């Protein structure tokens, strides 16, 4: 059978695949030795693409291998992280240092929580002053692009119609600690230090108060809607995780007490298909749960070397969990094996963080973002290789307590103890 000549570039690609496979399998020192020997031109990410190609080669002829290498759905930049295949993906999305502040909104107290709607059109912010604001992202972008002379000549009616803050909600009596948009309805859920979970119908411009609420026994710390919108997970200061039916407010908990955390729950999140959810706790553990039975599937003990787990979220394909802890490290976990595949280090070099904040993906999952508490800057890493990118100074006058990135476009919101929330966006050259 005729075979094409193997050139230098082919061998370089082979060596990169070998390094990626060694990193994926946990042979870090061997991989580093090979890296030092062959000096690849770009950073290698953990991946088992080589194993898949070998399996194809053993099962089929070499044309199948060539087909696998060239398939558009094997390596698809911008669709999310998948280390089984995308060891050599070229990053297409902008890194954090290219974003700029487009709008700033102020509360009357520290702003410590924010959330995006599923379509990326709305952002809600919550404050220690017990208020909630809902902002329209298109209006924020339009406002930032508006010439100052046009802005100064706006009538009161025009200003109201174009104002980015479309709702301000007041019904809590203490700090708002968590927020979540309903996946299909114009409903916003909020949790507070006042021990209540409240539901707001923001489709009505005059609505300032919640139309439903749940009285909890402890301060709420994190909430997450089931993708159907029929249920909501609630993590509180108490270690027992709750699941509520939002129509009847019936509460469900795991039938096995051993499933539960041993300290306050800091983070709860469903995956996109609702067959799993993940929790992180002050006890230092990450727990993965079955979305149907509400039973704990597995526990990652001392996920951040015993430090408090601040956040835990799923990748788009639900193969990975991105977590952060008070050790100022972000980690990418492979769910099928429970292993840490990638560590994102370098934040907190000037001192270990004191307050909770989150690690997040950008909208394409090409980057991982994590605020640095001491420098008030945003650390950015290549999600596949953990290569550090340029820092972004966040412009706040106090520590950043929350970051949320848009699920659909290059925008994110930062919330700070300086009472402000900043909306950041990376405009394209055609904007």
From Swiss-Prot:
<dbReference type="InterPro" id="IPR044633">
    <property type="entry name" value="CstF1-like"/>
</dbReference>
<dbReference type="GO" id="GO:0005848">
    <property type="term" value="C:mRNA cleavage stimulating factor complex"/>
</dbReference>
<keyword id="KW-0677">Repeat</keyword>
<feature type="repeat" description="WD 1">
    <location>
        <begin position="106"/>
        <end position="145"/>
    </location>
</feature>
<feature type="repeat" description="WD 6">
    <location>
        <begin position="395"/>
        <end position="430"/>
    </location>
</feature>
<dbReference type="Pfam" id="PF16699">
    <property type="entry name" value="CSTF1_dimer"/>
</dbReference>
<dbReference type="InterPro" id="IPR032028">
    <property type="entry name" value="CSTF1_dimer"/>
</dbReference>
<comment type="subunit">
    <text>Homodimer. The CSTF complex is composed of CSTF1 (50 kDa subunit), CSTF2 (64 kDa subunit) and CSTF3 (77 kDa subunit). Interacts (via repeats WD) directly with CSTF3. Interacts (via repeat WD6) with BARD1. Interacts with ERCC6.</text>
</comment>
<feature type="repeat" description="WD 3">
    <location>
        <begin position="215"/>
        <end position="254"/>
    </location>
</feature>
<dbReference type="Pfam" id="PF00400">
    <property type="entry name" value="WD40"/>
</dbReference>
<dbReference type="InterPro" id="IPR038184">
    <property type="entry name" value="CSTF1_dimer_sf"/>
</dbReference>
<protein>
    <recommendedName>
        <fullName>Cleavage stimulation factor subunit 1</fullName>
    </recommendedName>
</protein>
<dbReference type="InterPro" id="IPR019775">
    <property type="entry name" value="WD40_repeat_CS"/>
</dbReference>
<dbReference type="GO" id="GO:0005654">
    <property type="term" value="C:nucleoplasm"/>
</dbReference>
<keyword id="KW-0539">Nucleus</keyword>
<feature type="region of interest" description="Hydrophobic">
    <location>
        <begin position="14"/>
        <end position="35"/>
    </location>
</feature>
<keyword id="KW-0853">WD repeat</keyword>
<feature type="repeat" description="WD 4">
    <location>
        <begin position="260"/>
        <end position="301"/>
    </location>
</feature>
<dbReference type="InterPro" id="IPR015943">
    <property type="entry name" value="WD40/YVTN_repeat-like_dom_sf"/>
</dbReference>
<dbReference type="GO" id="GO:0003723">
    <property type="term" value="F:RNA binding"/>
</dbReference>
<keyword id="KW-0507">mRNA processing</keyword>
<dbReference type="InterPro" id="IPR001680">
    <property type="entry name" value="WD40_rpt"/>
</dbReference>
<feature type="repeat" description="WD 2">
    <location>
        <begin position="171"/>
        <end position="210"/>
    </location>
</feature>
<comment type="function">
    <text>One of the multiple factors required for polyadenylation and 3'-end cleavage of mammalian pre-mRNAs. May be responsible for the interaction of CSTF with other factors to form a stable complex on the pre-mRNA.</text>
</comment>
<feature type="repeat" description="WD 5">
    <location>
        <begin position="303"/>
        <end position="343"/>
    </location>
</feature>
<dbReference type="GO" id="GO:0031124">
    <property type="term" value="P:mRNA 3'-end processing"/>
</dbReference>
<dbReference type="InterPro" id="IPR036322">
    <property type="entry name" value="WD40_repeat_dom_sf"/>
</dbReference>
């Amino acid at each position: 059978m005729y075979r094409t000549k193997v050139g230098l570039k082919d061998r370089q690609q082979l060596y990169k695949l070998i390094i990626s496979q060694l990193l994926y399998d946990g042979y870090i020192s061997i991989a580093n030795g090979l890296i030092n020997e062959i000096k690849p031109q770009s950073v290698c990410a953990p991946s088992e693409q080589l194993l898949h190609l070998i399996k194809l080669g053993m099962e089929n002829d070499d044309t199948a291998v060539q087909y696998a290498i060239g398939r558009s759905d094997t390596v698809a930049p911008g669709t999310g992280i998948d280390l089984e295949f995308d060891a050599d993906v070229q990053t297409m999305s902008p890194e954090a240092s290219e974003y700029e502040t487009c709008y700033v909104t102020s509360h009357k107290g520290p702003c410590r929580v924010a959330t995006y709607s599923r379509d990326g059109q709305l952002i809600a912010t919550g404050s220690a002053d017990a208020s909630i604001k809902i902002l329209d992202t298109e209006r924020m972008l339009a406002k930032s692009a508006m010439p100052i002379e046009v802005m100064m000549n706006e009538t009161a009616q025009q200003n109201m119609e174009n104002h980015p803050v479309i709702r301000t909600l007041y019904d809590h009596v203490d700090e708002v600690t968590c927020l979540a948009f309903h996946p299909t309805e114009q409903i916003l859920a909020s949790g507070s230090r006042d021990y209540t979970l409240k539901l707001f119908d923001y489709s009505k411009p005059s609505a300032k108060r919640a139309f439903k609420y749940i009285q909890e026994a402890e301060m709420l710390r994190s909430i997450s809607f089931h993708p159907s919108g029929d249920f909501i997970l609630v993590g509180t200061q108490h270690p027992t995780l709750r699941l509520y039916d939002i129509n009847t407010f019936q509460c469900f908990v795991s039938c096995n007490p051993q499933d539960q955390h041993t300290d306050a729950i800091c983070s709860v999140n469903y995956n996109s298909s609702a067959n799993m959810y993940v929790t992180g706790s002050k006890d230092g553990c990450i727990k993965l749960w079955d979305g149907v039975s509400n039973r704990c599937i597995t526990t990652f003990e001392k996920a951040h070397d015993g430090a408090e787990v601040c956040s835990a979220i799923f990748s788009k394909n639900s193969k990975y969990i991105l977590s952060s802890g008070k050790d100022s490290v972000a980690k990418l976990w492979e769910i099928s094996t429970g292993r840490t595949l990638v560590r994102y280090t370098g934040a907190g070099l000037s001192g270990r963080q004191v307050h909770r904040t989150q690690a997040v993906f950008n909208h394409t999952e090409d980057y991982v973002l994590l605020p640095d508490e001491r420098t008030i800057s945003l650390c950015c890493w290549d999600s596949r290789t953990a290569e550090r990118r340029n820092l972004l100074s966040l412009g706040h006058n106090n520590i950043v307590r929350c970051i949320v990135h848009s699920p659909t476009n290059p925008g994110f919101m930062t919330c700070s103890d300086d009472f402000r929330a900043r909306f950041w966006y990376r405009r394209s050259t055609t904007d």
